[in-house]
Amino acid sequence: MDNTISKAIIRINSKLNERFIFLIDEWDVIYREQEYNTKLCDEYTELLRNLFKSSNVSSCIDLVYMTGILPIRRYSTQSTLNMFTEYNMLDSFPIESYVGLIETEVIGLCNKYNRDFNEIKKWYKGYILNGISLYNPISVVESIFRNECDEYWNKTSSIETLTDYMNYDNGKLKDIICKVLLGEKAKVNVRKFENDLTKVNSSDSALTILIHLDYLAYDKKLKVCYIPNYEIKKEFERALKKLNWKEIYNPISNSKKLYEETLKGNVEFINKTLDENHKDLAGPFNKNKEDILGVIVEISYYSAKQFYNIKKEDTSILGRSDLSFIPYDNCHIPLIVELKVNSTPDEVIAQIKEKSYFNSLGNYHGKVSLLGISYDEKTLKHNSKVLIIEL
């Protein structure tokens, strides 16, 4: 390795008695874009080691500050770059408040420029590091500057950045992606990732990369990952289409139409759509008979998440799935959905009325849409009934 740079640093320090500060942006770009060029990556690692670990050179340096995406690669022996203190999306203590915009900063910007904080919060909130809520600065600033919440994430990276790691599948990853799309959290062992993009050999490794890329957020205490906000959820939807994961993408893409037809009481459309979605969703996922009921209902009405806070009752052991759609505003009426195996739509509607589902609506007074769905295990068909009531 040619140590010309190192020698130059030593000579300058010796002559001028000045110490150096290095600021390196995207320090990991070679590892990310040339990951299979082992020779180049090794040469780059050696360059960094000679610059910053050599005792002769390090005595001439006050600070090295490098920013990037990937953590430092782990080696079978002691890391050649172990002289750095790392802060990443798994653990940024004690500088987490500088990783993104904190909530008080976002509120301040909204007040200054007369923007709707609740709308920005809905689109961009979700990253939490050591209890501190963080927002993506680019997305927040763009939305305030343009006075419109939109997907500004895709202006900074290509969709392949996401799909490359979603495409790893050992039979579990599709199930996990489906789970986080529905707003749930998935267990992940981040220690299985060796910080090496050439060694993505498990769903845990793939998920950990997505955490470092900010497509997933990470809860260190619970050791779970999740999609942080609405903007990133839209990125995953684009990725599903790009990957041609029809078994998930088709039900999601049809969910807006299903929601609209449900409000119209079009039971024929509801039954037909649920039948098709059951065929799509029952096969690929590691779900038992009862669990798949909830998945079908939630994905079938996926687009409604934009307008509703969806609460579900854990009733899978009873062979049914119960969901309460609580609107964020007064423009949408509440919707209560129950799906039950080997029943009738009338019986399901009666059961909705008997249960205390309406408690989740608080002091709401007005129209409520009830959707009762029965699933026949013999015919593999759905039958539905829609009823509008007044509270």
Q: Which stretches of residues belong to each language-model region?
A:
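Phosphate-binding site recognition
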Residues: 1-289, 304-307
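Active-site metal-binding core of divalent-cation-utilizing nuclease and nuclease-like domains
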Residues: 11-16, 300, 305-330
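Switch/connector loops and helix/strand junctions flanking conserved nucleotide-binding motifs
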Residues: 30-32, 73-79, 345-348, 378-385
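Mg2+/Mn2+-dependent nuclease catalytic core
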Residues: 41-47, 341-358
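Metal-dependent nuclease catalytic cores in nucleic-acid-processing enzymes
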Residues: 50-58, 208-216, 298-303, 351-371
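Conserved catalytic cores of phosphodiester-cleaving nucleases, focusing on short active-site segments
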Residues: 297, 321-325, 333-341, 355
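Domain-level recognition of nuclease-like catalytic cores that cleave nucleotide substrates
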Residues: 360, 366-391
